[in-house]
């Protein structure tokens, strides 16, 4: 393996947000492992090197693995001295008062307070984590952060140009086959003139140039399309700000053959200027399959 492995170790106080952090790194394209005993790290690296396919890893290591926690600093330092691994430690913290509030809200027990008071467990954990906190490259106090705000902070620091952290799926479909259940935005274009009733277009679909030109040259189509693209371009930054990693835009006509296909394809091409876009024509082949079965 010639690529450098980017390793982020997520650790910190219990209840400070490690689960949210791990989910954020997953959305940034990291291979994530939760609660790995540090003693297994050397074997894990051997497997990673042999695979040659993983370049970004996030590990959650905390006092749930208390029996294995000793020596973690030395193990990470050993990895950091190689050309193969670049290591960063992200330590999540919160005030005692906020941690108590979160534990009371979730009604969970602290891993170090099973036979005692909650505050005793928190104080003991702080003591045990002092060394790794001091060694951390990044300490985030989450006391005043919502899960979304913590996610945004992680994205700002760790997002790189190759992160596939947001993409758009444009889908055409036919209402006669049902709404796509995974769509975030659904547009109904059945108000547009239907090429199905034009004899020379009936056997074609919206990817064929004659049909595409027919659909897009309609005055109602052009007006609708300009308004649609203006709307979508204005709201996409909001989806990004809220931390969404994907948006599915579904455009439907009666059978999913002509109007929706032509519009979905054009929309995908235009949005691809600014965002990663995939396009799917869900029902375009269904009429052909139906004819072949008859």
From Swiss-Prot:
Which regions span the lipid bilayer?
A: none
* Binding residue positions for GTP: 62-65
> Origin, by domain of life?
Bacteria
Q: Which GO terms describe its molecular function?
A: ATP binding; GTP binding
**List of residues binding ATP:** 12-19
Q: Which UniProt keywords apply?
A: ATP-binding, GTP-binding, Nucleotide-binding
Q: Which residues form a coiled coil?
A: none
Gene3D superfamilies, per database record: P-loop containing nucleotide triphosphate hydrolases (3.40.50.300)
Task: Note the SS bond partners.
Answer: none
Stated family: Belongs to the RapZ-like family.
| Function summary | Displays ATPase and GTPase activities.
UniProt name for this protein: Nucleotide-binding protein LCA_0526
Report the source organism. Latilactobacillus sakei subsp. sakei (strain 23K) (Lactobacillus sakei subsp. sakei)
């Amino acid at each position: 393996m010639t690529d450098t492995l980017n390793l982020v170790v997520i650790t910190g106080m219990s209840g400070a947000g490690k689960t949210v952090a791990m989910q954020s790194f997953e959305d940034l394209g990291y291979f994530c492992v939760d609660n790995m005993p540090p003693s297994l790290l050397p074997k894990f690296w051997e497997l990673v090197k042999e695979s040659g396919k993983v370049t970004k890893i996030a590990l959650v290591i905390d006092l749930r693995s208390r029996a294995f926690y000793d020596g973690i600093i030395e193990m990470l330092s050993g990895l950091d001295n190689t050309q193969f691994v670049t290591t960063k430690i992200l330590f999540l913290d919160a005030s005692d008062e906020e941690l108590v509030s979160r534990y009371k809200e979730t009604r969970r027990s602290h891993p170090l307070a099973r036979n005692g008071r909650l505050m005793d467990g928190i104080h003991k954990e702080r003591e045990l984590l002092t060394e790794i906190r001091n060694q951390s490259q990044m300490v985030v106090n989450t006391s005043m952060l919502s899960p979304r705000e913590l996610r945004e902070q992680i994205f700002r620091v760790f997002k790189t140009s190759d992160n596939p952290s947001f993409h758009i799926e444009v889908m055409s479909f036919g209402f006669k086959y049902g709404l796509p259940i995974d769509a975030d935005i659904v547009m109904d274009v059945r108000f547009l003139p239907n090429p199905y009733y034009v004899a020379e277009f009936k056997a074609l679909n919206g990817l064929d140039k004659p049909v595409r030109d027919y659909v897009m040259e309609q005055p109602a189509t052009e007006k609708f399309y300009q308004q649609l693209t203006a709307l979508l371009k204005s709201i996409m930054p909001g989806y990004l700000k809220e931390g969404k990693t994907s948006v599915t835009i579904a455009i439907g006509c009666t059978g999913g053959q002509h109007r929706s296909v032509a519009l979905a394809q054009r929309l995908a091409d235009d949005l691809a200027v600014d965002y990663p876009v995939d396009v799917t024509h869900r029902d375009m082949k269904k009429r052909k399959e139906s004819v072949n079965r008859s």
